[in-house]
């Protein structure tokens, strides 16, 4: 059998893949790799805090792992908010190899609060006091809030001694119930501004103002126009407003299912709420707008998920905030850094409003002539038309309540991201910025932290022009911050333990404070010692923190340093600086575990698709060919069977005599032809009550196959005739026609009874008529109508005859039926194979009662009188019975 073989790869396929690779590089430009990758062995030199106290090298034996929630740096002191504990850690000296706490505050939940928490269905590990708010209230006071087993509580503590100051207060609307929920908080003018949830089920999201000398205010409750499942990220104070940065589901895109967008909202610090009729004890200055961080083009590519925001910094004389955005989890992985000018943010809140006139309509801008005056959202103050927000007209208050969304989005500086990283293994979620890097303090370094603790360091050069664009950012370095030997191995800590919580710059010590759930690591901002001994590498690193010293070392440069050094952050050619071993770019991509090449990924995907398509095509072709080959083999097998062993199955039974006469056995041979004795073909023709052994075992007479029925003599299908009238039993042509039709109909469901060819050689032995024959006439006379019963056959030697045999049992209850089936007499001419077996003698030829079916011409001379069928005719036609078969 032919088996297909898969052809070898053709040069055309290889050429196609190479061409595809070239096109891919053109469509997806490769992102620049870092100029340097810090070796992982440097992690062992970084100081780490894991809960160790004074005089301890490690945490106390048997102590729980840390579960850090908040980190606050105040000058040279670091406060770490943990589960049930608050630590005070001194950051000096900066050369220490271990960070230890100097003071520790244990703040556990009450047993009653824990019992209530467990009754509400929470786990034991959740019913603890997690520090979620950690703020500096004044120069000597810390404001701390904890979840307190899903019953938030807040208190004031001394910053120096961690002693409780005053009584505790409720943390509702100031601290979330669940430690997994996000929240932001800040103090401004002695008032606490928080953004969190106010209920146990985290349904009611709120921006809340409390404490201070002004009334408590909150956002409208359960209004999707104000909030729709928000996730609060950061809050900053600027001017007379407090700005909140968050992401939420956009109601203006309700026709696009759930679309997450980034927002900035603001409220006036001096807002005192609305009138008793509208917005009482609620914000009257709350407005929100969208943050636009997208790649420009015919169709903008948006980074909609806000991850982190810096404080307000000055870049080129502008108040700027930097924000990290990412794509949704079900989209192409990517992150971007966009900068926003606070002046442009404020200008958007002075623009047009957006509204939805009906729940089914889309959101459209509100015409300026429909905006009431004074402008909704403004800060009412003494000296203005309205001295306080509570004095505003109801028209303005109603407009603010129903139109909190601005029509325009806040554009990013340069209308494009400053930094874009796509197809990273982990998204960027944290950001820290140093706007005074370098010996002259005029360089801007951006540190981006990923979910797994990998930090990317970029040098950005913002343009001081009005457009606010920036030049190409330089990817300086990539380094790790998570210490698995102290913070826990990824196999045990998992992704949760390695998640980067915060990234804060400690410029005084030249380091970064990276907080993880189980540890806090201080990492230097630069590793200049890696380039010592090679001037080309030190200067080629373009790192503002590093410079080449005359003694042949690469040193760390602090702002205002007076040391002599060489540095080039512009990226000029270093060809004239000589060569040295371990060139910088030669070892860049040795261990870039956090990045994946776009070109490699796209090319591999397309190549896998092409190869899979080719293999699938060959597989389908092979299976189709296999099915065709099996079908061909099946047809050949059938033909072989018919040609060798089954020829008698398709030949006319009337030709068996010729096959026997011409076969190897001939008539007198013993073989009986190549297909065996023809009696084997006739055995299945016998029905119940007739023996097959008489044909298979033979007898004293051979079977004359020439006398078998031909297709022309095959009876026609039986057609049931209408029942004649009971009085139609008189003599005449009508009675004969009825009997003739009865005989024809009964013959169609009967067997073929054959007589041997040598029947004429046997003497005629008269036999006594059986009981059925003697009773035939009386029973037939009693019949009122013909029944579907077979006829009694009679032998006739003159020609081939077809008679009827019984095909089913007779119903003895029918008293007016025709005579029952005929049984052959027990004569000496019929031999039995056993004492009880049926006769095995060959059957004699019989005559068909339907003379119309006899084949004309060519018959042998008649040796016996024709059979008498008068007993089947209606009453009065005769009393004769059929003579027995001799």
Swiss-Prot record:
SUPFAM superfamilies given in the database record: Plexin repeat (SSF103575), Sema domain (SSF101912)
Q: State the UniProt keywords alphabetically.
A: Cell membrane, Developmental protein, Differentiation, Disulfide bond, Glycoprotein, Membrane, Methylation, Neurogenesis, Signal, Transmembrane, Transmembrane helix
Q: Where is this region: Disordered?
A: 655-677, 697-731, 761-886
Q: Which GO terms describe its molecular function?
A: semaphorin receptor binding
Q: Which organism is it from?
A: Mus musculus (Mouse)
Q: Which residues are tagged as glycosylated in the record?
A: 75, 156, 292, 387, 442, 463
User: If researchers knock out this gene, what phenotype do they report?
Assistant: Mice lacking Sema6b are viable and fertile but display abnormal projection of hippocampal mossy fibers.
Q: Which residues form the Sema domain?
A: 32-525
Q: Compositional bias (Gly residues) at which positions?
A: 662-674
The UniProt entry, under Gene3D superfamilies, shows: ligand-binding face of the semaphorins, domain 2 (3.30.1680.10), YVTN repeat-like/Quinoprotein amine dehydrogenase (2.130.10.10)
Residues crossing the lipid bilayer are: 606-626
List-wise, which residues carry Omega-N-methylarginine?
667
Q: How does it assemble?
A: Homodimer. Binds specifically the SH3 domain of the protooncogene C-SRC.
Q: Where is the secretion signal located? A: 1-26
Found, by tissue, as follows: In adulthood, it is expressed ubiquitously.
Topological domain spans for side Cytoplasmic? 627-886
What family is this protein classified in?
A: Belongs to the semaphorin family.
Protein name in the entry: Semaphorin-6B
Describe the function of this protein. Answer: Functions as a cell surface repellent for mossy fibers of developing neurons in the hippocampus where it plays a role in axon guidance. May function through the PLXNA4 receptor expressed by mossy cell axons.
Asked whether the UniProt record includes Disulfide bond among its keywords, one would answer: yes
Q: Record's SMART domains?
A: Sema
Composition bias, Low complexity? 707-718
Question: One Pfam match, by short name?
Answer: PSI
Q: Which InterPro entries does the entry mention?
A: Plexin_repeat, Semap_dom, Semap_dom_sf, Semaphorin, WD40/YVTN_repeat-like_dom_sf
Topology relative to the lipid bilayer, per the entry, is: Single-pass type I membrane protein
């Amino acid at each position: 059998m032919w088996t297909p073989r898969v052809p070898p790869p053709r040069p055309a396929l290889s050429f196609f893949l190479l061409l595809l690779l070239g096109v891919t590089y053109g469509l997806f430009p490769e992102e620049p790799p870092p100029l340097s990758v810090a070796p992982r062995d440097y992690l062992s030199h970084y100081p780490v805090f894991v809960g160790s106290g004074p005089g301890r090298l490690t945490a106390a034996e048997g102590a729980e792992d840390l579960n850090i929630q908040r980190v606050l740096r105040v000058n040279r002191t670091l406060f770490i908010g943990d589960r049930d504990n608050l630590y005070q850690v001194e950051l000096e000296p900066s050369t220490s190899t271990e960070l230890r706490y100097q003071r520790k505050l244990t703040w556990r939940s009450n047993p009653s609060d824990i019992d209530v928490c467990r009754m509400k269905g929470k786990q034991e590990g959740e019913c603890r006091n997690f520090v979620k708010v950690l703020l500096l209230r004044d120069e000597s006071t810390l404001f701390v809030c904890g979840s307190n087993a899903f019953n938030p509580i807040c208190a004031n503590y001394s910053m120096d001694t961690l002693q409780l100051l005053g009584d505790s207060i409720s943390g509702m609307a100031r601290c979330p119930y669940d430690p997994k929920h996000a929240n932001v908080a800040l103090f401004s003018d002695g008032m606490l501004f928080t953004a969190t949830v106010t209920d146990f089920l985290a349904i009611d999201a709120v921006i809340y103002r409390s404490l201070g000398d002004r009334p408590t205010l909150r956002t409208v409750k359960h209004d999707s126009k104000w909030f729709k499942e928000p996730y609060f990220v950061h809050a900053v104070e600027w001017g007379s407003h407090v700005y909140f940065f968050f992401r939420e589901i956009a109601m203006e895109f309700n026709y696009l299912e759930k679309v997450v967008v980034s927002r900035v909202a603001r409220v006036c610090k001096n807002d005192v709420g609305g009138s008793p009729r509208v917005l009482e004890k609620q914000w009257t200055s709350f407005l929100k707008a969208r943050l636009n961080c997208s790649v420009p083009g015919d169709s903008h590519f948006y980074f909609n998920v806000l991850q982190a925001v810096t404080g307000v910094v000055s870049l080129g004389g502008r108040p700027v905030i930097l924000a990290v955005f990412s794509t949704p989890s079900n989209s192409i992985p990517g992150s971007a850094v966009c900068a926003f000018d606070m002046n442009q943010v404020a200008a958007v809140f002075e623009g047009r409003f957006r509204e939805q006139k009906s729940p089914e309509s889309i959101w459209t801008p509100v015409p300026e002539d429909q905006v009431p005056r004074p402008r909704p959202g403004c800060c009412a103050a003494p000296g203005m038309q309205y001295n306080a927000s509570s004095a505003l007209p109801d028209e303005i208050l109603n407009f603010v309540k129903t139109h909190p969304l601005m029509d325009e989005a806040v554009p990013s500086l340069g209308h494009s991201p400053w930094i874009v990283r796509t197809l990273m293994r982990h998204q960027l979620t944290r950001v820290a910025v140093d706007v005074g890097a370098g010996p002259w303090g005029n360089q801007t370094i951006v540190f981006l932290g990923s979910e797994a603790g990998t930090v990317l360091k970029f040098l950005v050069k913002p343009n001081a022009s009005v457009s606010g664009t920036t030049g190409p950012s330089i990817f300086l370095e990539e380094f790790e911050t998570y210490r698995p030997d102290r913070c826990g191995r990824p196999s045990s800590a998992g992704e949760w333990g390695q998640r980067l919580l915060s990234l804060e710059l400690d410029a005084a010590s030249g380091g970064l404070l990276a907080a993880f759930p189980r540890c806090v690591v201080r990492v230097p901002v630069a590793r200049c010692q890696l380039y010592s001994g090679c001037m080309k590498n030190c200067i080629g690193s373009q790192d503002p923190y590093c410079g080449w010293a005359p003694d042949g070392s690469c040193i760390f440069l602090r702002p205002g340093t007076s040391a002599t050094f060489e540095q080039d952050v512009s990226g000029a050619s270093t060809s004239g600086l000589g060569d040295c071993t371990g060139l910088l770019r030669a070892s860049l991509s040795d261990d870039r575990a956090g990045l994946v090449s776009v070109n490699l990924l796209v090319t591999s995907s397309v190549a896998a698709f092409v190869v899979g398509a080719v293999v699938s095509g060959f597989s389908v072709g092979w299976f189709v060919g296999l099915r065709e080959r099996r079908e061909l083999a099946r047809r050949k097998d059938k033909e072989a069977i018919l040609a060798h062993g089954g020829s008698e199955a398709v030949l006319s039974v009337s030709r068996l005599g010729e096959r026997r006469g011409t076969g190897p056995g001939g008539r007198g041979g013993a073989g009986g032809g190549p297909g065996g004795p023809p009696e084997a073909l006739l055995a299945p023709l016998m029905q119940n009550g007739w023996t097959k052994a008489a044909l298979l075992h033979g007898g004293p007479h051979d079977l004359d196959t020439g006398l078998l029925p031909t297709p022309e003599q095959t009876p026609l299908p039986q057609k049931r005739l209408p029942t004649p009238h009971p009085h139609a039993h008189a003599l005449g042509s009508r009675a004969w026609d009825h009997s003739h039709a009865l005989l024809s109909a009964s013959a169609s469901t009967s067997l073929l009874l054959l007589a041997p060819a040598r029947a004429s050689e046997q003497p005629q032995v008269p036999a006594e008529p059986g009981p059925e024959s003697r009773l035939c006439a009386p029973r037939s006379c009693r019949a009122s109508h013909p029944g579907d019963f077979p006829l009694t056959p009679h032998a006739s030697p003159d020609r081939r005859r077809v008679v009827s045999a019984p095909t089913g049992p007779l119903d003895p209850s029918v008293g007016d039926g025709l005579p029952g089936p005929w049984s052959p007499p027990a004569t000496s001419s019929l031999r039995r194979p056993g004492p009880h077996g049926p006769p095995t003698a060959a059957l004699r030829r019989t005559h068909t009662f339907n003379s119309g079916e006899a084949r004309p011409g060519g018959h042998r001379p008649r040796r016996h009188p024709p059979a008498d069928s008068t007993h089947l005719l209606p009453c009065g036609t005769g009393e004769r019975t059929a003579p027995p078969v001799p």
